[in-house]
């Protein structure tokens, strides 16, 4: 526990230092390259490059700050033995180092260290609980991510033909573009590689909060931000189509999903499609802003959901979370804040990027089919978000039998995360100096955002009514007349207390008394046996003496 607390505090201080350095580089408008020539073979130079600019340092600040809050959060959430806690901490630190290598690497030779490290350590974290479902989910995760690693290796093979590991305009061809897109699509879970992200929810919730919401899944987006100028315009249309379909289908599935953790996972998948579609237009600054803001409120959302699951005995069914606002008001307030940020509620975290991106969609030139997909996907985002708010704030019969005291460490880490997301999102938005005068939209497009929000609210209310109907009829049958729920919430603690009493009091006392009784009995038997042996020895000795005297006299 002390080790994790010290690690979290040190990383928080390091993240603050990285933020100051990024602001300093942004003020100077400078970039730094560090090159280390490892080996030279003919004309090929194996150089290890590091690119340090304000984007890379800002992303390092983001990853370090989220990591520090989640490590402090995990002290209470991951209630494990010391050995398992050390394994969890070391895996998370290895993941953080791999993420640093990915962020700072500008060429394909040095990026492979972070890229392969992310895939391998992500697999180790998904199978952390050592269950069969975790093993199958981890295998799907690593196999789909290995497809992107194959693309990276093929790019490195093609680049040996040109004599350089650095991508450039005059050394690009069609195959390299396809392989770069394959890398980005597999790591950021775009269609048809999007199945691994919901399956990766078998990992512990702190892992999902760090890995599968803010860092690993955004690695493909960050890669394309670096190399977006090398992509052809025709490929950008295909990227827009695939990303819009990802956003549409992820939002559609999230409206029918009853697993609370998977709802947040599909929400992450929808936002990844949203960022990828914006990247196809070419607005890298807006994408980086939304990547930064989305990482904060989505990790916060996972932390809130994980704390609910921690108190509900790992029950992830959304139908069991009715009325949680009245039981855990502080935690519910933080979760509603993150949900409203996801919807782009005015002057919250997501408003600064999402509203501007939607206006850029209407201002840009794209395929009508992609535009329709993005509009419907945005409506679905509001729909499942409003459904979650209705579930939390509604009253339900079983809410009165569920109560567990809120954990202070979890609440403090979530509250700090919410405050930091509010401050830093507005700070980054002001520092990027967007030229908003170039966006001149008609009033009908300005009002389109509010229309989408209203349609999403209506759809969310209808989905909520559908779940409520199924909750009254279907769940009553499924839970065996609520007996499973009553057992988990009421009987389980009593049975565990009885079991503890039997093991540690009754059985231990009996064992102690029986052991003492046996020891006394054995001592008595040993004493009797020793006395018997002495008598036997004396008898034999007397007999021998008598025999000796007899022989002498004879």
From Swiss-Prot:
UniProt topology in membrane: Multi-pass membrane protein
Keywords noted in UniProt: Electron transport, Membrane, Mitochondrion, Mitochondrion inner membrane, NAD, Respiratory chain, Translocase, Transmembrane, Transmembrane helix, Transport, Ubiquinone
Signal sequence extent: none
Catalytically driven reaction(s): a ubiquinone + NADH + 5 H(+)(in) = a ubiquinol + NAD(+) + 4 H(+)(out)
Recorded GO MF terms: NADH dehydrogenase (ubiquinone) activity
Family of the protein in this entry: Belongs to the complex I subunit 5 family.
Protein name in the entry: NADH-ubiquinone oxidoreductase chain 5
Annotated source species: Apis mellifera ligustica
UniProt gene name: ND5
């Amino acid at each position: 526990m002390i080790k994790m607390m010290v690690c979290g505090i040190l990383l928080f201080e390091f993240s603050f230092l990285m933020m100051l350095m990024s602001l300093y580089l942004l003020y100077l408008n400078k970039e730094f390259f560090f090159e280390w020539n490892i080996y030279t073979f003919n004309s090929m130079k194996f150089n290890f490059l590091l690119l340090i600019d304000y984007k890379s340092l800002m992303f390092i600040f983001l990853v370090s700050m989220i990591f520090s809050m989640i490590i402090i959060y995990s002290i209470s959430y991951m209630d494990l033995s010391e050995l398992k806690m050390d394994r969890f901490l070391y895996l998370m630190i290895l993941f953080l180092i791999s993420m640093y290598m990915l962020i700072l690497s500008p060429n394909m030779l040095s990026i492979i260290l972070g890229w392969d490290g992310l895939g391998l350590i992500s697999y180790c974290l998904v199978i952390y609980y050592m269950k069969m479902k975790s093993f199958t989910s981890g295998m799907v995760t690593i196999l789909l991510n290995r497809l992107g690693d194959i693309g990276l290796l093929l790019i490195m093979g093609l680049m040996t033909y040109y004599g350089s590991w650095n991508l450039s305009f005059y050394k690009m061809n069609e195959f390299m573009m396809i392989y770069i897109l394959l890398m980005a699509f597999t790591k950021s879970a775009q269609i048809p590689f999007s199945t691994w992200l919901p399956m990766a929810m078998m990992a512990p919730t702190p892992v999902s909060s760090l890995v599968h919401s803010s860092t690993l899944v955004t690695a493909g987006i960050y890669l394309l931000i670096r190399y977006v100028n090398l992509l052809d315009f025709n490929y950008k249309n295909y990227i827009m189509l695939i990303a819009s379909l990802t956003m549409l289908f992820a939002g559609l599935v999230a409206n029918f999903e009853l697993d609370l953790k998977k709802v947040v996972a599909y929400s992450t998948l929808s936002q990844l499609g949203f960022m990828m579609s914006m990247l196809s237009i070419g607005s890298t600054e807006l994408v980086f802003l939304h990547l930064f803001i989305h990482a904060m409120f989505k990790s916060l959302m996972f932390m809130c959901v994980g704390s609910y699951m921690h108190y509900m005995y790992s029950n992830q069914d959304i139908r069991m979370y009715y009325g949680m606002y009245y039981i855990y008001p502080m935690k519910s307030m933080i979760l509603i804040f993150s949900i409203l940020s996801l919807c782009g509620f005015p002057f919250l975290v997501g408003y600064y990027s999402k509203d501007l991106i939607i206006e850029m969609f209407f201002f840009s030139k794209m395929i009508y089919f992609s535009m329709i997909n993005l509009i419907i996907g945005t409506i679905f985002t509001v729909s499942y978000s409003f459904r979650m708010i209705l579930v939390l704030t509604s009253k339900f019969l079983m809410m009165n039998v569920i109560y567990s005291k809120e954990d202070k460490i979890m609440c403090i880490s979530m509250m700090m995360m919410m405050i930091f997301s509010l401050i830093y999102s507005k700070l980054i938005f002001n520092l990027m100096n967007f030229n908003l005068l170039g966006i001149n939209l008609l009033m009908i497009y300005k009002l389109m955002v509010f229309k989408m929000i209203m349609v999403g609210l209506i759809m969310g209310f209808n989905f909520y009514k559908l779940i409520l109907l199924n909750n009254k009829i279907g769940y009553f049958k499924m839970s065996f007349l609520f007996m499973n729920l009553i057992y988990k919430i009421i009987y389980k603690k009593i049975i565990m207390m009885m079991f503890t009493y039997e093991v540690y009091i009754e059985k231990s006392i009996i064992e102690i008394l029986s052991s003492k009784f046996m020891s006394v009995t054995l001592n008595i038997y040993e004493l009797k046996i020793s006395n018997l042996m002495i008598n036997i020895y004396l008898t034999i000795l007397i007999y021998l003496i008598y025999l000796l005297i007899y022989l002498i006299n004879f």
